[in-house]
Curated annotation (Swiss-Prot):
One of its GO terms (biological process) is 5-phosphoribose 1-diphosphate biosynthetic process. It is an enzyme of class 2 (transferase). The keyword Acetylation does not apply. SMART domains: GuKc (SM00072). It catalyses: alpha-D-ribose 1,5-bisphosphate + ATP = 5-phospho-alpha-D-ribose 1-diphosphate + ADP. One of its GO terms (molecular function) is ATP binding. Transmembrane segments: none annotated. It comes from Yersinia pestis. Keywords: ATP-binding, Nucleotide-binding, Transferase. Catalyzes the phosphorylation of ribose 1,5-bisphosphate to 5-phospho-D-ribosyl alpha-1-diphosphate (PRPP). ATP binds at G9, P10, S11, G12, A13, G14, K15, D16. This is Ribose 1,5-bisphosphate phosphokinase PhnN.
Amino acid sequence: MARLIYLMGPSGAGKDCLLSALRNATPQNRVVAHRYITRPADAGAENHVALSKQEFIQRAEQGLFALHWQAHQHCYAIGIEINLWLQHGLDVLVNGSRAYLPEAQRRYRHQLLPLCLTVSPAILAQRLRQRGRENSEQIDARLQRAQHYQQQLPSHCLQLCNDGELQHTLNQLQQLLTLDTPLSDPVEDKPCN
């Protein structure tokens, strides 16, 4: 059965870099979906489809999104094209929201494989400071939010630590994706310490 691999993690965990590396190394039976976001195309590292707020609302009303949510003053969506890809037997990776995971699970049930990219608090704080988008108060809030969500992950959520080199994390991800883990059974958690 094709899987919807729902990648989550805090800002600064390296999701965009990991998905970009995976796009370049992806086998033919796996695709990485682009997100539709109400922010400029050149904002951040993510390769996304930029929409105005009005375009986003119109597409949502027309049923063109499989999943959509709001976070950090922006709207995010995954297009309905993922349903066609899944029907064709392709595994689909998406950059999802931790807060939206219950809705994604409701919609995709046993097809959904939750995967959380984790980073130790010290490294996450360092990365957030280096990118320079937030002040220290906002960074503290992001760190608290990351810790809260880490504690709330479901037991069947795979965890992948991204404290080291990107290539190492990519290799680990590719190994995880080749496993035939039943999607409804719990798997061993491997958080960062």
